[in-house]
Amino acid sequence: MYLQLKSKLENVLSYFFRKMSQGYDNYDDMYDQNGASPAPSQNEKPGKSGPGFVGIKFCPECNNMLYPREDKESRVLMYSCRNCEHREVAANPCIYVNKLVHEIDELTQIVGDIIHDPTLPKTEEHQCPVCGKSKAVFFQAQTKKAEEEMRLYYVCASQDCQHRWTE
């Protein structure tokens, strides 16, 4: 029972933080006229730790959950209790982190015509190891491990090949 309640609370909080990051001014604005809110989507996973998890704050007076709100006069993020009117200024202005991590293969698949992208530089000094053509598009990116250095990635400019490699 406890795990079910915890999971449900995490889903609700995930939805809440996502809506707050989308520009809703307060918790009440997230609901429709009938008081219902859409359920979080199935592919949303509530964060338990790491950079995507911001945390839950509780009221020091009544132990209820504190909700993020904006103080419209001073334009400061506040946490406020709905039960006892306790308010405190947020130490961290971040209420939600959405970190996107993609592999290089995924990045080149997202932009299907990467070889025709006019914003990317082209080179004729690096020969494709698959087809032997000497024209390639290149870009710099970082792998999943943030501690690694940026690497230079090449994509063969041949329409038939489009092989991806790094040196």
UniProtKB/Swiss-Prot annotation:
**Organism source for this protein?**
Caenorhabditis elegans
Residues at which Zn(2+) 2 binds: C128, C131, C156, C161
Q: Where in the cell is it found?
A: Nucleus, Nucleolus
Top-level taxon of the source organism? Eukaryota
- Please identify the protein, giving its name as recorded: DNA-directed RNA polymerase II subunit rpb-9
Q: Which GO terms describe its cellular component?
A: nucleolus; RNA polymerase II, core complex
Xref: SMART domains? RPOL9 (SM00661), ZnF_C2C2 (SM00440)
Q: Which GO terms describe its molecular function?
A: DNA-directed RNA polymerase activity; nucleic acid binding; zinc ion binding
Query: Subunit composition?
Result: Component of the RNA polymerase II (Pol II) complex consisting of 12 subunits.
